[in-house]
Amino acid sequence: MHKYEHRKIEEKWQKHWLDNKLFKTKNDRFHQKYYVLDMFPYPSASGLHVGHIEGYTATDIVSRFKRMQGYNVLHPMGWDAYGLPSEQYALATGKDPKSFTYQNISNFKRQIIEMGKGVDWDKELATTDPEYFKWTQWIFKRLYEKGLAVLKDVEVNWCEGLGTVLANDEIEIINGQMVSERGHYPVIKKPMRQWVLRITEYADRLLDDLALVDWPENLKEMQRNWIGKSSGAVIEFEVASTDYKFEIFTTRPDTIYGVTYCVLSPEHPLVEKIVTQDEEKDVLRYIEQTKMKSDLDRIADKSKTGVFTGAFAKHPLTNQLIPIWIGDYVLPQYGMGAVMAVPAHDDRDYEFAMQYGLNIIEVIKGGSEGAYTGDGIHHHSGIIDGLYNEEAIEKITKHLEDRKKGYKHYTYKLRDWVFSRQRYWGEPFPVIYDEDGQIHLVPDDELPLELPYLEFIKPSGTGESPLANARDWLYVDINGKKGRRDTNTMPQLAGSSWYYIGYILKSNLGYIPLDSKEAKAVLDQFLPVDLYVGGTEHAVGHLLYARFWHKFFYDLGFVSSKEPFMKLVNQGMILGADHSKMSKSKGNSVSPDDFIQSHGADALRLFEMFMGPLEAEKPWSNEGLEGAKRFLDRVWRMFDFEITQQPVDALQTVYHQTVKKVTEDYEKLAFNTAISQMMIFVNEVYKTKVIGAAQARGFLKLLNPIAPHLTEEINETVLKHHEDLVYSEWPTYDESFLIETEVEVAIQVNGKLRGRLQVKKDMVEEDLKKLALEHENVIKHVEGLTIVKVIVIPNKIVNIVVR
């Protein structure tokens, strides 16, 4: 064979795939669909790194494998192109975000093509394309019409450094302080009027439907914890000597008889109404001090603080007077902004009671110092005396309901999605406010509402986005009145919440209207996504919001599946050679470009899949890449051997074992062990120096999803097949060849290994003894000694006992 020139071969096949649109999704309802999806990338200036290649190769292997199994495969690619990173880069460089975003997209696309990924490029989309975000804006309008998008005065995470509001999942905690995920700028709490999406309306469905999907359990648990559903009871307390009442939520209503004080958040509207004159000065001072703290500071402080209001509440069952305090560890947005304190059975309440000398009443037998928080028998508890926790909770809740003092209730940690960003580079809201402050939606036929060009996109400094400076764009006529557009833009997560649907609806004419019968038919054909591969960092951001939007689409009848992504796999991070996370600042980030030139895309793909299990973290190694290249060179040279029309008998067992193993491993995404099995097969071929034509082509099919360029080249130039392997039929195995006809038997002398025999399975015992005693190394070790006995364990061991 001619020399294996990887770049020449790879460029040839990449051109062939593009020119012939080989991976275009077919309009085929007769074959079962398979939708393989990558978490689409943000197109940064630095381009793809080898971590991207890992996930993208894994999905490409599956899409090629499924195509060969006869599925109608959808495997698209697009770009998550809006958002803060681009805007920050534009501010730093003075460049227009639109121009460099599309330059970056071109570079990313080049890299993905050069890695040999089989993508349907007719489905390509970018969240910044007007024809795409037209539908993002259209979806917002439908959310508004259904009461799920509302303007609210909310306490938001304000980042002065970025000049915008951030969602909870866009914030990190460093040294106890809230900072932005991007740039680590300080973040504070601040009240602002914002667009909010009412994801909390879907909290129970988001929880319950996790049972429908095949996701990693740790990721499901992250979503469960983020939603944070708690079961308990709301209990009403009356303020003594007044007509005022307040409610608390507790998960432990069974401890009601152990309540010795109540604590309101400093922001609770009742505080200013019930504080006594004697305590007012201290209370007001404490409220001002609380305003200087973030929520994180308030709940993280080990020493709980508070002040007495001077007021008392009546115990709802005993009418005993209970002091009412305020404490900053009680947050206004959680529960009811008020707690009943049971210091004998809650660690936080116990610390507070000890600090301020408040009463402690045990109502569950625990016998421990400090707070007892476990299960136990109730006492001093009226009608629930003698009961354990679960039964006591149910009985006391019913008792409170009967007395109109409480009711069963659920609370959630999940908060509605703050959807406004005070930045330029995002989807504009299709909203106009008239002079009376009334909201008017931009008509559907006027969408998309595009961003105006601005030479300077620095935040306005007033809390509004740079769009406040675009006067010609900002002010419009609305029914003869002066109207003003919304200056906020949508968050980056808006476009990514439905892009998996966008791929399906993408056509030569734009996008099939989401509410059309045609859209319903094609969405029913391809949804849900069969395999979604991406990182765990999106667990409580993109993945949660996409599920929310999908359920909204389900309610509108646009989709028939309750969940968007049936199987989710989190690929492990590829670390730097120093075992730390790759980053440009550390200088350990690895670009695939140089390696594709020097070793080839097939070698890079093979190496990344051979490094270890897909889900595991793995350090980068140039030496490992060399090994992958050597294996492919070995496969190339293997086709210099004689190729016979008939299968080679000596290879039949290992060939069929390899077909079975690789097929099963591809299904499990266990690519590293599939490669190991193919290496075993190649080693066996090198022993025989001959291979059957069907065995040769079958092996090429097995390797093709991982090394598509090399295998297609051999298939065409050596085997003279003109059908692309990727559309050939996946090989099958014959069970009869999987039955082992030979076994390896160990020979021991006095229990020590002295040799091995390759013999027919179930060989006659006397024949096996004879072969063992004739083994050259055994003869040496028994010479001059007396053989006492020979023990045979069939198909495993012959042990010769001598003295």
Curated annotation (Swiss-Prot):
Membrane-spanning intervals of the chain: none
Family membership noted in the UniProt record: Belongs to the class-I aminoacyl-tRNA synthetase family.
A Gene Ontology term for the protein's cellular component: cytosol
Cited InterPro entries: Leu-tRNA-ligase, Leu_tRNA-synth_edit, M/V/L/I-tRNA-synth_anticd-bd, Methionyl/Leucyl_tRNA_Synth, Rossmann-like_a/b/a_fold, tRNAsynth_Ia_anticodon-bd, Val/Leu/Ile-tRNA-synth_edit
Aminoacyl-tRNA synthetase as UniProt keyword: yes
Biological classification of the source: Bacteria, Bacillati, Mycoplasmatota, Mollicutes, Acholeplasmatales
One Pfam assignment: Anticodon_1
Listed NCBIfam families: leuS_bact (TIGR00396)
Position of sequence motif 'HIGH' region: 41-52
Catalytic reactions on record: tRNA(Leu) + L-leucine + ATP = L-leucyl-tRNA(Leu) + AMP + diphosphate
Source organism of this protein record: Acholeplasma laidlawii (strain PG-8A)
Localization terms from the record: Cytoplasm
CDD domains: Anticodon_Ia_Leu_BEm, LeuRS_core
GO biological process: leucyl-tRNA aminoacylation
Statement: the UniProt record of this protein carries the keyword Ligase: yes
Keywords, alphabetical: Aminoacyl-tRNA synthetase, ATP-binding, Cytoplasm, Ligase, Nucleotide-binding, Protein biosynthesis
E.C. number: 6.1.1.4
Name of the protein in question: Leucine--tRNA ligase
GO molecular function annotations of the record: aminoacyl-tRNA deacylase activity; ATP binding; leucine-tRNA ligase activity
Motif ('KMSKS' region): 581-585
Main subcellular location: cytoplasm
Gene3D superfamilies in UniProt: 3.10.20.590, HUPs, Isoleucyl-tRNA Synthetase, Domain 1
SUPFAM superfamilies: Anticodon-binding domain of a subclass of class I aminoacyl-tRNA synthetases, Nucleotidylyl transferase, ValRS/IleRS/LeuRS editing domain
